[in-house]
């Protein structure tokens, strides 16, 4: 997992509430178990017209938003089925963080396990962030747990263990491997029933 300490980047605002995993990445794209190649299908039904052409009115398709690394959204983002692929689509597109009013528990956990930082901010903070222009940046400082835009700085909460994993760029396997010697010693003490 790529370390996340600070991110300064442009943001895309999709302020809708209740964006579920089927909207983020429709079911027809779940046939692959690789974590790459999903970015082009992110928000597929919103990004493309019925004839397959780009919906130029959709925020992700606007040239000014290309390369954005932060998504600002509404409440209850990522609800619906447990679809790790939805997180993969967001990260493959280039998003490093999603700022919302809340996330489904499963989506939140899938995000933390796959290097997408989910940040919960109240409506009054997100209302200010929704005013961001395409050429402006937001800075996320994970050690300080802050989001800064212009002269505004907002604090967010995150579990200390997840924070450490993000800062160190460690996934669950990396975390387990820290205990490799202890695990090996324990296994040597156990009888072999093989």
UniProtKB/Swiss-Prot annotation:
Matches recorded under SUPFAM superfamilies: LeuD/IlvD-like (SSF52016)
Reaction(s) the record says it catalyses: (2R,3S)-3-isopropylmalate = (2S)-2-isopropylmalate
Gene Ontology cellular-component terms listed: 3-isopropylmalate dehydratase complex
Molecular functions per Gene Ontology: 3-isopropylmalate dehydratase activity
S-S bonds: none
Keyword annotations: Amino-acid biosynthesis, Branched-chain amino acid biosynthesis, Leucine biosynthesis, Lyase
EC number assigned by the record: 4.2.1.33
InterPro entries: 3-IsopropMal_deHydase_ssu (IPR004431), Aconitase/3IPM_dehydase_swvl (IPR015928), AconitaseA/IPMdHydase_ssu_swvl (IPR000573), IPMI_Swivel (IPR033940), LeuD (IPR050075)
Pfam families linked to this entry: Aconitase_C (PF00694)
Pathways per UniProt: Amino-acid biosynthesis; L-leucine biosynthesis; L-leucine from 3-methyl-2-oxobutanoate: step 2/4
Biological processes, Gene Ontology terms: L-leucine biosynthetic process
This protein's record includes keyword Lyase: yes
Amino-acid biosynthesis recorded as keyword: yes
PANTHER family: 3-ISOPROPYLMALATE DEHYDRATASE SMALL SUBUNIT, 3-ISOPROPYLMALATE DEHYDRATASE SMALL SUBUNIT 2-RELATED-RELATED
Function: Catalyzes the isomerization between 2-isopropylmalate and 3-isopropylmalate, via the formation of 2-isopropylmaleate.
Family: Belongs to the LeuD family. LeuD type 1 subfamily.
Quaternary structure, from the entry: Heterodimer of LeuC and LeuD.
Protein name, UniProt field: 3-isopropylmalate dehydratase small subunit
Gene: leuD
């Amino acid at each position: 997992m790529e370390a996340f300490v600070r991110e300064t980047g442009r943001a895309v605002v999709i302020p809708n509430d209740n964006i579920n995993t089927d909207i983020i990445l429709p079911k027809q794209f779940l046939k692959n178990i690789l974590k790459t190649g999903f970015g082009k299908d992110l928000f597929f039904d919103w990004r493309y017209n019925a004839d397959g052409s780009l919906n130029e009115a959709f925020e992700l398709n606007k040239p000014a938003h290309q390369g954005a690394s932060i998504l600002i959204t509404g409440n209850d983002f990522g609800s619906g089925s447990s679809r790790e692929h939805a997180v993969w689509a967001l990260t493959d597109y280039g998003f490093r963080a999603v700022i919302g009013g809340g996330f489904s528990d499963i989506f939140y956990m899938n995000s933390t396990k796959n290097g997408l930082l989910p940040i919960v901010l109240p409506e009054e903070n997100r209302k200010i962030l929704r005013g961001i222009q395409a050429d402006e940046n937001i800075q996320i400082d994970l050690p300080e747990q802050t989001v800064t835009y212009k002269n505004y700085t907002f604090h967010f909460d995150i579990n200390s263990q997840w924070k450490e994993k993000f800062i160190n760029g460690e996934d669950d396997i990396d975390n387990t491997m820290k205990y490799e010697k202890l695990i090996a010693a324990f296994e040597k003490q156990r009888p072999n029933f093989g």
